[in-house]
Structure formats: structure tokens, C-alpha cells
Amino acid sequence: MKVKYIKKTNVSLTEAKTYDVMSVEKGSYRIVDDTGEDYLFQPEDFEIIEK
């Protein structure tokens, strides 16, 4: 799944940038952020671009 980050407050993600969701775990998205590390993020911070 591809998602676009729609918030401004996270230093490891870029506003309006598209990210690939590696997996969905307990309702959160596992995404590789701009530092190259993967973390869990809240779905409400993203807009789904492609399922």
C-alpha cells in the first residue's frame, strides 16, 4: 500500500511525501521513514494513495 503523509509535526517524515507501508500491525502502519529506519505510525497521519 502507498500512503501520503498529511501532517507536519514528525521530523522523520516529510509532509506530502509518499511512503510504502511494509505491513499493518495492530492498526498501525510500519513505514521506513526518512532516516532509513522502519517504525509504526498512526494511520490518521496518512492518506491512502494506492491499496
Residue ranges and their predicted role:
Residues 2-45, 49-50:
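Basic/aromatic-rich interaction segments and small domains that mediate binding to polyanionic partners
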